[in-house]
Curated annotation (Swiss-Prot):
It comes from Prochlorococcus marinus (strain MIT 9313). The RuvA-RuvB-RuvC complex processes Holliday junction (HJ) DNA during genetic recombination and DNA repair. Endonuclease that resolves HJ intermediates. Cleaves cruciform DNA by making single-stranded nicks across the HJ at symmetrical positions within the homologous arms, yielding a 5'-phosphate and a 3'-hydroxyl group; requires a central core of homology in the junction. The consensus cleavage sequence is 5'-(A/T)TT(C/G)-3'. Cleavage occurs on the 3'-side of the TT dinucleotide at the point of strand exchange. One of its GO terms (biological process) is DNA recombination. InterPro entries: RNaseH-like_sf, RNaseH_sf, X-over_junc_endoDNase_Mg_BS, X-over_junc_endoDNase_RuvC. One of its GO terms (cellular component) is Holliday junction resolvase complex. Keywords: Cytoplasm, DNA damage, DNA recombination, DNA repair, DNA-binding, Endonuclease, Hydrolase, Magnesium, Metal-binding, Nuclease. Binds 2 Mg(2+) ion per subunit. It is found in: Cytoplasm. This is Crossover junction endodeoxyribonuclease RuvC. GO terms for molecular function: crossover junction DNA endonuclease activity; DNA binding; magnesium ion binding. Homodimer which binds Holliday junction (HJ) DNA. The HJ becomes 2-fold symmetrical on binding to RuvC with unstacked arms; it has a different conformation from HJ DNA in complex with RuvA. In the full resolvosome a probable DNA-RuvA(4)-RuvB(12)-RuvC(2) complex forms which resolves the HJ. Its EC number is 3.1.21.10. Its cofactor is Mg(2+). The gene is ruvC. Mg(2+) 1 binds at residues 7, 139.
């Protein structure tokens, strides 16, 4: 099964693609979709949707796993929620099933504790995907953790 993990954001959207068809998890790709901070949020949403469409066409995921947020008053909350909506809509247009996970569930699935530190989750990502080096940037590593959670929780 090919799974696309997504760490939503407005400035940077992390993505990670894993394949599980050979009995073990393998990283195929990871990175970020970076938007131009000099344009309005609507145009940034167009950039996110366009780049995500390219990823979907390239990797043809059978499942998407997206981080679900619970915000407590933040100036970027509305923009990130809007970006997340664009991501979910784009996946739906390509008929990619979506699973959503809050951060604590991702930490629990990978590190065994919903209160695990970021480095514990990163260690689990490296172990599960048999990586010698940590994926960079952090948003991409987070997206791989989300993809793995999708695999474990499917």
């Amino acid at each position: 099964m090919r799974i696309l993990g997504i760490d939503p954001g407005i400035a940077r959207v992390g993505y990670g693609v894993i394949d599980t068809s050979n009995g073990q998890q393998q990283m195929l790709d990871c990175g970020i979709i970076r938007t131009n901070p000099g344009i309005d949020d609507g145009e940034r949403m167009v950039e996110i949707a366009s780049d995500l469409r390219q990823l979907i066409r390239r990797w043809k995921p059978q499942l998407a796993a997206v981080e679900k947020f619970f915000f407590y008053r933040s100036s970027t909350t509305i923009s990130v929620v809007q970006a997340r909506g664009v991501i979910i809509m784009t996946l739906a247009r390509f008929r990619v099933p979506v699973m959503e996970f809050p951060p604590m569930q991702i930490k629990l699935a990978l590190a065994g504790s919903g209160h695990a530190e970021k480095d514990e989750v990163l260690d689990a990502v490296m172990r599960e995907l048999n990586l010698d080096q940590p994926p960079r940037p952090d948003d991409a590593a987070d997206a791989l953790a989300i993809a793995l959670t999708g695999w474990f929780q499917r």
